[in-house]
Amino acid sequence: MSAPKNEMYYSLLEWFKTLNLNAPHADAESLADGVALAQALNQFAPESFTDAWLSKIKASAVGSNWRLRMSNLKKVTQSVYDYYSDVLNYSLSDFSKPDLQRIAEKCDLGELERLLQLVLGCAVNCAEKQSYITEIMCLEEELQANIMRALQELEATRQASTPEGGVASSLSRGSRTGLLDSKAVQEDRDALAQKCFETEKKMLLLIDEKTNLQQELHKLQQEFARLEQHSTVIGDDGVSLGPVQTGSVRYNELRRQLDLLKEELLQSEGAREDLKIKAQQQDTDLLHMQMRIEELMKSSAEVTTLKDEVDVLRESNDKLKICEAQLDTYKKKLEDYNDLKKQVKILEERSADYVQQNAQFEEDAKRYANTKGQVELFKKEIQDLHAKLDAESSKNVKLEFDNKNLESKNLALQRAKDSLLKERDNLREAVDELKCGQLSSNTALTGTTVSRELQPSATVEKLQRLEAENKALREGQGGQTALAQLLDDANKRCENLREQLKTANERILSLSHASQSDDPILKESEFGKQIKQLMELNEQKTLQLEEAVTQSTSLQCKVTQLETNLSAREQEILVYDAKYRKCVEKAKEVIKSIDPRIASALDASVLEKSADLVEEEPKPKMSVMEEQLMTSAFYRLGVNAQRDAIDSKLAILMGSGQTFLARQRQSAPRKSLSAMKSK
């Protein structure tokens, strides 16, 4: 797996950005001076990277001076290598050391990647490594994979074991718990394959070395045998060394060479044993690696199967949600259907009540039609009586006014009489007495006539009788037109009473002015009586006016109530007509579905009946509905009878050419018309 260019650097930079540092560390230029790296190392391991060491890093006045950057980076890298070798017991001999000059001069991303890789190893091997590992696991999956690969490359160069068992193993354990996905497993498998390849290469090199050593040993043995066979040997200077005897120079020289060769042989055998042990260890490691690869393959297969199962469960969960939503909608529809059933029952009960009410209303209308004539006669009589009452009241007012004028004249004559009585002599007493008698008789006659005219007992009784009759008519009358006419009459009466009240007030004012213009001492008592009488009449008329107003308001309320009831009943009748039409249309559709010929005949009959209904007088709605229901029932009965006849004929035809048992096995025909009629 070859990663894209500088992908690991950007992943390490994203991890480095998560650290809380004072120095800027967002890009390559800010990391090239080594200040941010030194602060990070001080944060990871303050016991190794002390504050005194951090003070040696020149943070200020670095700028673009690459030599100062170079010195800072040298201090950082040297301290990091010392930390790996002394504290972590790591050998970084196989790890390529970053080129600090390229980092200082050009901010090379590849070299910065290796330097950040070393800093990452310090972070995940410090005392607080668990917190940094959890921070790495909080990153995105791609970043985690790249960081894991960087740690594995760093782990591959390790030469000595640590008590913790390695950073990659600890991080792999964490990744098993937190990053169990196919991508991480694939990367682990690639890393293990790389390790296996490297171990195989090392094993081949060791085998080559072993063969070379065996060849050299064989050559030495051959040379030793050759030297033992020859008695005389010529040395390097061309001088014969003599025979090989104990104690001779040649013997000693050969003994020394033999000892050296034995030591070399022992060393080569020890190296061979070491190589064997290493080869065995590498074979065991290879087997472990292969087993681990197989386990990882199994885990990846399990992961894929689990993913497939998760996808299946998701699909089933989505289907379950859809089914639950459909179930909720069906429940709501069922509840609505039950509510509609209840409403239909209520409407059927109401329709039955309305049919009864309509029948009662038709009976009431028939009864009220007979009383309309009587009401009109009573209205005419009431109007005539009101006109007579108005004429008599106007006459009464005129007579009262004339009576008052006569009384004023009478008082004036009495005063004149009293003055004349004092001046007359005793001789004219008889004449005066006769005259006074005549005057008294005239006044008595006029007083009796006036009193008779002023007595309102007959008119009052007549008025009371008319009002009682009017009330009785109002209580017995139920029609709207009669109430409206009574209301108009009452309004007219109120207007007449108001006009009479105005005239009475005008008379009172005129009389009060007249009383003020005459002698107040003599006329005070008489005018007071007249004023009291007029006030009493005024109060009576105001009471009558108030009663008439209350009656008119009550009549208006009744009229409004009757209008509202009438409008409501008209609306109900319209609703029932619409329902009836819908029912008739449905019946037509049903009949058409049964037999179109009967439907056409039914349409023709309905058209004829509609024409007859138009020509004839309008019938009541209930009778029309009954006729229509009877026709629909008759046609339905005819359809059923025709169907039964056809079924019986078919049964006869099918059973004619069969045996008795075969006819018994045939399905029985439908019920006959007589059975239906009996039901």
UniProtKB/Swiss-Prot annotation:
> What does the UniProt keyword field contain?
Coiled coil, Cytoplasm, Cytoskeleton, Developmental protein, Endocytosis, Endosome, Microtubule, Synapse
InterPro entries, A to Z: CH_dom, CH_dom_sf, Hook_C, HOOK_N
From the Swiss-Prot or TrEMBL record, what is one GO molecular function term?
Answer: microtubule binding
Instruction: Tell me which GO cellular component terms the UniProt record holds.
Output: centrosome; cytoplasm; endosome; microtubule; synapse
Q: Where in the cell is it found?
A: Cytoplasm, Cytoskeleton; Endosome; Synapse
Record region (Interaction with microtubules): 1-155
| Span of domain Calponin-homology (CH) | 6-123
Do you know which Gene3D superfamilies this protein is assigned to? Calponin-like domain (1.10.418.10)
The knockout note for this entry states: Life span reduction.
One GO biological-process annotation of the entry reads:
cytoplasmic microtubule organization
Q: Which residues form a coiled coil?
A: 135-437, 480-574
Any Pfam family from its record, for instance, is HOOK
Task: Specify whether Coiled coil is a keyword of the entry.
Answer: yes
Quaternary structure annotation from Swiss-Prot or TrEMBL: Homodimer. Interacts with microtubules via its N-terminus.
Note on domains (UniProt): The coiled coil domain mediates homodimerization.
PANTHER family per record: HOOK PROTEINS, PROTEIN HOOK
- Protein purpose: Involved in endocytic trafficking by stabilizing organelles of the endocytic pathway. Probably acts as a cytoskeletal linker protein required to tether endosome vesicles to the cytoskeleton. Involved in modulation of endocytosis at stages required for down-regulation of membrane proteins that control synapse size. Not involved in synaptic vesicle recycling. Required in R7 cells for boss endocytosis into multivesicular bodies (MVBs). Has a role in regulating adult longevity.
In the record, the note on similarity to other proteins reads:
Belongs to the hook family.
This chain belongs to the protein called Protein hook
The taxonomic lineage of its organism, from the top, reads:
Eukaryota, Metazoa, Ecdysozoa, Arthropoda, Hexapoda
The UniProt gene name for this protein comes to hook
